[in-house]
From Swiss-Prot:
Organism: Homo sapiens
GO biological process, one term: mitochondrial alpha-ketoglutarate transmembrane transport
Family label: Belongs to the mitochondrial carrier (TC 2.A.29) family.
Protein name per Swiss-Prot or TrEMBL: Mitochondrial 2-oxodicarboxylate carrier
Solcar repeats: 11-100, 107-196, 205-294
């Protein structure tokens, strides 16, 4: 008698994991070029540097001319390897935290936001080593063929700096802030607004209703969390002076960037980030919901 609920729980968890992994894989394959551009903007420090990008269009032009088409896909292997477990963790833990918070008398709005925060913090711990490798590869301006392999670069980091907070897990506090804040806003906004706007009986209009809310969710979350993202890129990317660590901790890095470069420097890469995580956030939620719905009906 007790076997059925257990199988049901395992199957439910499996659906959430498969749907979340599928959402992540689709999103990264579509949107990675914008992530490369965003990272390049965030790690450049001086507008007078001849290698700096003047605008979004200029960055696309220079990367294509100097590094070729594959330059836009630098560092894609770490997120591909990480996206399935990362997004699976994102959506699965969100659902689990939401269930746990159901035992506490919280408003639905607060429940969605806190569950999102919890899922973001959990996701950050899983993904941070992959992010360290990805940012390092994206910062490399050599041609795709000349840059080190993903595994080779990860080995370099481990050999020189180890596994800890100065090595493969550097920037963990900034990653926790980035993912925690993003997911809190992303899930909190999406599910609260979705519940306010009536469901449309026309499947095409219903698709666009969800896409529009997802787009807004990803955009707003990106604007709010980007200072953490800039700090993360500075900590995990190449330091200004080789052999000297300038950027160590999240809030100290934010303060340094603000003091030396001004408030706008904390929003570097905002446009490519919005272009990626606005539609990308909508794609993830839609792929998750439609895949999960299909799995419910067929498995």
């Amino acid at each position: 008698m007790s076997a059925k609920p257990e199988v049901s729980l395992v199957r439910e968890a499996s659906r959430q994991i498969v749907a979340g992994g599928s959402a992540g894989l689709v999103e990264i394959c579509l949107m990675h070029p914008l992530d490369v551009v965003k990272t390049r903007f965030q790690i450049q420090r001086c507008a007078t540097d001849p290698n700096s990008y003047k605008s979004l269009v200029d960055s696309f032009r220079m990367i294509f001319q100097m590094e070729g088409l594959f330059g836009f896909y630098k560092g894609i292997l770490p997120p591909i390897l990480a996206e399935t477990p990362k997004r699976a963790v994102k959506f699965f833990t969100f659902e689990q935290y939401k269930k746990l918070l159901g035992y506490v008398s919280l408003s639905p709005a607060l429940t969605f936001a806190i569950a999102g925060l919890g899922s973001g913090l959990t996701e950050a711990i899983v993904v941070n080593p992959f992010e360290v490798v990805k940012v390092g590869l994206q910062a490399n301006r050599n041609t795709f063929a000349e840059q080190p392999s993903t595994v080779g670069y990860a080995r370099q980091i481990i050999k020189k700096e180890g596994w800890g907070l100065q090595g493969l897990n550097k920037g963990l506090t900034a990653t926790l802030g980035r993912h925690g804040v993003f997911n809190m806003v992303y899930f909190g906004f999406y599910y609260n607004v979705k519940n306010m706007i009536p469901v449309n009986k026309d499947p095409i209009l219903e698709f666009w209703r969800k896409f529009g809310i997802g787009l807004l969710s990803g955009t707003i979350a990106s604007v709010i969390n980007i200072p953490f993202d800039v700090a993360k890129s500075r900590i995990q990317g190449p330091q200004p002076v080789p052999g000297e660590i300038k950027y160590r901790t999240c809030f100290k890095t934010m303060a340094t960037v603000y003091q030396e470069e001004g408030i706008l420097a904390l929003y570097k890469g905002l446009l490519p980030k919005i272009m990626r995580l606005g539609p990308g956030g909508a794609v993830m939620l839609l792929v998750y919901e439609y895949t999960y719905s299909w799995l419910q009906e067929n498995w």
